[in-house]
Amino acid sequence: MYPDYPYFAVAITRTCGSGGGSYIGKQLAKAFDIDLYDRKLLRLASEDSGISEELFARADENTRKTMLYRVSERVYDGSIIPPESGNFISDENLFNYQAKVLRELLNEESYICVGRAADFVLRDKPNVLTVYVDAPYDWRVEREMKRQGIGSSQAKHYIDKLLSLIHISEPTR
């Protein structure tokens, strides 16, 4: 631990079905007795901004991976669009509020964050551990089948669709 940084964060990125968030993230949070932020971050960003949590959730669903990673490549610089602007509820500004909350939380508590481009948002912080969780494709398909109660072809379609949103394709199987 760095003496100037009493808190730490673990930023988990993962492939769909790997268990990175639903299992590993939860286990780490439990072991360290700290909060796990995933969709919970939307509520905090809503409280911070005064923007409806539903708008954050809608933007999150609409932009899922592509927007988060496109915006996050510039890394949050502290700028937030003011309420009087027509772009106040733009996807970029909603992302900026989430990034702002992630950075501010690091001054208040240790936490685990799953997704939310936290690895990019917090990459300049020395007290952040970034973890990437992956698993074999067939294992992830099995996991999604059980988690969602769906068949193999549906699980494959679901995983492949999410991967296509971030322009990643599975190696030839």
Which residues does each predicted region cover?
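ATP-dependent small-molecule kinase phosphotransfer cores
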Residues: S46-S110
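ATP-dependent NMP and nucleoside kinases share a basic, alpha-helical "lid"
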Residues: Y97-Q148
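Glycine-rich phosphate-binding P-loop
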Residues: I12-K26
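Residue-level preference for the first positions of well-ordered beta-strands
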Residues: Y7-A11, S110-I112
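Extreme N-terminal, non-catalytic leader segments
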Residues: M1-Y7
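Residue-level detector of conserved catalytic or cofactor/ligand-binding positions
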Residues: S164-T172
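Glycine-rich phosphate-binding loops of nucleotide-dependent enzymes
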Residues: S152, I159
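Short beta-strand-centered segment that lines the nucleotide-binding/catalytic pocket of NTP-utilizing
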Residues: D35-S46
